[in-house]
């Protein structure tokens, strides 16, 4: 089923949903999400947002129901493996890995348990919401185990006597710590990713996708970059430039009153830390300003 409007699936609720919405707004897509609506129409572009459960998004893409989808790589790979096992459609194209939504799927055991490696999990029962990712990892390790399938509160399984270990998503590790568990193996590293359905697109829809990708790249580049302005002694300019990794060569302008210094303007492709600013100061730089960049196009 195809329409003239670009259909983008995003998670209905949660932090990933908020970050995807913020990214689209920074890309110039205007919309108002109100109430429990499933479909939200953009106010200024031929784009519809579908607000759905995160684990529904890969299937909607693979079945060609929607054009694009933002989803965590952990959910995407779990769905792909599940559909592969069931001989169902599992094709998609990854367009861009995002710089948000980071987490990892890890195996954790009770804090006081001895652990020497994956072979210690032989014959154990492991609780998880990601059975396919867990099985793929254990098969690579040659470990025989059984799965306890849970859809929530996986971390309480060992304490409740349901399992010997768990395989669950970890961000900071605070939840594991609170439940007397320790992380012992990382199964899968994940971030949010933008995926596209299989098949060709009409020219206008393909052009709109390219426009969005260009803007997303600009938003991410702006987030990772800073605009730097400073006054630098002419004789120290070469040394100062080595401290400032830039997207391009800096703009160097003469000062009206002080001929021994120049004004340097540049976009730095890396974060400028206090230590770097102190090094610049030590080389005679002054009036150092570091500014955020809202949008950027190379």
UniProtKB/Swiss-Prot annotation:
**What name goes with this protein?**
ATP phosphoribosyltransferase
What Gene Ontology terms for biological process does this UniProt record contain?
L-histidine biosynthetic process
Q: Does the keyword RNA-binding apply?
A: no
UniProt-recorded Gene Ontology molecular function terms:
ATP binding; ATP phosphoribosyltransferase activity; magnesium ion binding
Instruction: Give the catalysed reaction(s), semicolon-separated.
Output: 1-(5-phospho-beta-D-ribosyl)-ATP + diphosphate = 5-phospho-alpha-D-ribose 1-diphosphate + ATP
Enzyme class name? transferase
Sorted alphabetically, which CDD domains does this protein's record hold?
A: PBP2_HisGL2
What the protein does comes down to: Catalyzes the condensation of ATP and 5-phosphoribose 1-diphosphate to form N'-(5'-phosphoribosyl)-ATP (PR-ATP). Has a crucial role in the pathway because the rate of histidine biosynthesis seems to be controlled primarily by regulation of HisG enzymatic activity.
Q: What does the sequence similarity comment in the record state about its family?
A: Belongs to the ATP phosphoribosyltransferase family. Long subfamily.
The entry's localization annotation reads: Cytoplasm
For this protein, the Enzyme Commission number is 2.4.2.17
The cross-references to NCBIfam families, in alphabetical order and at most eight, read: hisG, HisG_C-term
């Amino acid at each position: 089923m195809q329409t003239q409007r670009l259909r983008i699936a995003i998670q209905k609720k949660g932090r990933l949903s908020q970050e995807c919405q913020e990214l689209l707004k920074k890309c110039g897509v205007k919309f108002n999400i109100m109430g429990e609506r499933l479909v939200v129409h953009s106010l200024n572009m031929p784009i519809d947002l579908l607000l759905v459960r995160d684990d529904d998004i890969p299937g909607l893409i693979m079945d060609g129901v929607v054009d694009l989808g933002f989803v965590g790589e952990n959910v995407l790979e779990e769905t792909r493996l599940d559909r592969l096992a069931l001989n169902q459609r599992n094709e998609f194209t990854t367009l861009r890995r995002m710089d948000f939504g980071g987490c990892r799927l890890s195996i954790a055991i009770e804090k006081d348990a001895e652990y020497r490696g994956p072979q210690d999990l032989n014959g154990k029962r492991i609780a998880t919401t990601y059975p396919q990712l867990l099985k793929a990892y254990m098969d690579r390790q040659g470990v025989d185990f059984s799965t306890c399938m849970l859809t929530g509160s996986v971390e309480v399984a060992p304490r409740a006597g349901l399992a010997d270990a768990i395989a669950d998503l970890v961000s900071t590790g605070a939840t594991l710590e609170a439940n007397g568990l320790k992380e012992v193996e990382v199964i899968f590293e994940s971030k949010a990713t933008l995926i596209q359905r299989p098949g060709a697109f009409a020219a206008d829809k393909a052009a709109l996708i390219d426009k969005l990708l260009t803007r997303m790249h600009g938003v991410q580049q702006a987030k990772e970059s800073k605009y730097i302005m400073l006054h630098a002694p002419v004789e120290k300019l070469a040394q100062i430039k080595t401290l400032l990794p830039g997207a391009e060569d800096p703009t160097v302008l003469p000062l009206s009153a002080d001929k021994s210094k120049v004004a340097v303007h540049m976009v730095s492709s890396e974060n400028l830390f206090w230590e770097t600013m102190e090094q610049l100061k030590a080389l005679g730089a002054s009036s150092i300003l570091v500014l955020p960049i809202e949008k950027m196009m190379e």
